[in-house]
Amino acid sequence: MILANTVWEAWDKTLETKDFTHLEKYLSADFQVEDTTGEVDNLENTKSWCVAGGLRINNFKTIRETKNYIVATHDVIQEGKPNSSVLVYAEQTNGKFTYWKIQRAFEA
């Protein structure tokens, strides 16, 4: 089981350094991330936006954590966009995250 704080730290370190190896070890080869609009990206597309820069996450709060999923919130700071908050639901199987769903709300 990957703890929520472990994956948050890896994701933030990836965004900070633009080095996907920090996060990649926690994601399955068939990893999918679904955004607020319902658009689904694969592992390669996730890597692309993670290493592009201009995005940071912070203020992590775990709501629920089990061996199969986590539910949490965090804030996002992204160049050219208002600050936002994200609700995350993420599933893991066999020690890797396979699915990540976000609901993102921007400040007015």
Predicted regions and their residues:
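A structural signal for short, well-ordered beta-strand elements
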Residues: 16, 39-40
